[in-house]
């Protein structure tokens, strides 16, 4: 089974399911067969794509799942990301209720700050976040993933909310403290996309002006 992967794709799909509205997804794809397949599949899901096409291979990956439902992902190729220099419809960002950034440069953060709610992941790169000098509404990452672990001393501006997830153990929200994960009595098939789905739900709630202190 082969589908578009990565945080951006999953967040866009989950938001599309939650809101029943058209979701705009700004991304970069390689000008190859994989890039073309990604574009067609995501478009058929009802997602509005704004693509910066690159003369490089589209990044690929495969996921291995163990008997406990835990997954390990192997990635092949360079990570492609849109930049502010790409001729995309950046002007529509100011009309958005909420934006989640998974890959970009610092200038895109500045343009996206016009949205009511702006969230991101540390995987974007702390230097990219700091160089934007933008105050984030939410910084969401896994406290179990070495690629997303960070300390507040590494941030030039402290986000309004920072959430570090820890899978079935719940996680930590700053300010607020530790929270527990909801117990799921269903059979666990796999954990692929759980963190990205969580991030999509969080953005949806914040953009809907739900009180985050109550729901955590």
Where in the sequence are the language-model features?
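Alpha-helix C-terminal capping segments
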Residues: 12-22, 205-207
